[in-house]
Amino acid sequence: MRKKMLASLQWRAIRMTTGISLLLFVCLISFMMFYYRLDPLVLLSSSWFGIPFILILLLISVTVGFASGYMYGNRLKTRIDTLIESILTFENGNFAYRIPPLGDDEIGLAADQLNEMAKRVELQVASLQKLSNERAEWQAQMKKSVISEERQRLARDLHDAVSQQLFAISMMTSAVLEHVKDADDKTVKRIRMVEHMAGEAQNEMRALLLHLRPVTLEGKGLKEGLTELLDEFRKKQPIDIEWDIQDTAISKGVEDHLFRIVQEALSNVFRHSKASKVTVILGIKNSQLRLKVIDNGKGFKMDQVKASSYGLNSMKERASEIGGVAEVISVEGKGTQIEVKVPIFPEEKGENERDSSIID
């Protein structure tokens, strides 16, 4: 339909210019006849190379009119075609496209106005997308805030109720053992089993509470925050904890993620590994920040680890969010090693140019 319309427009221009040429031809012949008082028979009899002169003039007029109409119509058709193609591009949602200059007449003015319209629509779309992103970020932040508050409430309730009751059970069983020294071995053994189970439950509860209500950096550097965290774990857990943490000048976001990864790793160790020793190492080597958490616990078979394991997935996701990778290596009966590698770019290196000799 559009091509037919443009073709019709071009042919109309050809017909118009050809008609004007014929009219001028008739006017010219009439002027020559009346002004020079020429006999029409003379004009008809005049020839050039055997071709009547009047026929030559007629052919020249028609040719000039046709050529002029074709060139003008084709140029007009091309400009309108460009304008229509551009409108279709805008209709398809590509508002970044701009119509090329089409001249200073009405068509060019229409193209300029369409470009201005596309620019305004593009800005409005960008503004809507920005608002949508901000809304999504706000919702995510609200969700995190609600989850954090709920975890704090749950941790507080567990500490005030279950943890205190477990402590009371442990104390009562210890007191009972003092008063039943003369009881049979079977009874004493069962009481000691209850005491041991209460102690294990207390350790599990401590690890769970630290996981639910974790310590945060709160303006401290990563080394200081990790040192306080590890010292707190050492006081609350019957396990040997060693660490070698290098000072690192990295961004706050990277520090927060690494701190959370260590928290998650320690929580997993205390809750599942049955380890007697944990080592935490943090240093820089080959333009990479490397974090290792190593325990001598029971380990697990790598091919049997659950893909849905929340702790391992959480650490891998946090490492990925800061452009790093988290690798887990475990040998059944020998322990587990979690290693996180994060690239350090030149602007982040600062004082970290020297490699850490503790990272192998």
From Swiss-Prot:
Q: Which GO terms describe its molecular function?
A: ATP binding; phosphorelay sensor kinase activity; protein dimerization activity; protein kinase activity
Q: What is its EC number?
A: 2.7.13.3
Transmembrane stretches in the record are 16-36, 48-68
* Catalytic activity annotation: ATP + protein L-histidine = ADP + protein N-phospho-L-histidine
Q: Which residues lie on this side of the membrane: Cytoplasmic?
A: 1-15, 69-360
Q: Which CDD domains match?
A: HAMP, HATPase_UhpB-NarQ-NarX-like
Q: Copy out the induction comment.
A: Induced, via LiaR, by antibiotics (vancomycin, bacitracin, nisin and ramoplanin), cationic antimicrobial peptides (human LL-37 and porcine PG-1), Triton X-100 and severe secretion stress.
One Gene Ontology cellular component term attached to this UniProt record is:
plasma membrane
Which subcellular locations apply to this protein?
Cell membrane
Q: Which keywords has UniProt assigned to this entry?
A: ATP-binding, Cell membrane, Kinase, Membrane, Nucleotide-binding, Phosphoprotein, Transferase, Transmembrane, Transmembrane helix, Two-component regulatory system
Classify the protein's membrane topology as the record does.
Multi-pass membrane protein
| Membrane-side (Extracellular) residue stretches | 37-47
Domain (HAMP) ranges: 74-126
Q: Any keyword Ribonucleoprotein? A: no
Domain of life, per the record? Bacteria
Against InterPro entries, the record matches this protein to: HAMP_dom, HATPase_C_sf, His_kinase_dom, LiaS/VraS, Sensor_HK_TwoCompSys, Sig_transdc_His_kin_sub3_dim/P
Protein name per UniProt? Sensor histidine kinase LiaS
Q: Organism source for this protein?
A: Bacillus subtilis (strain 168)
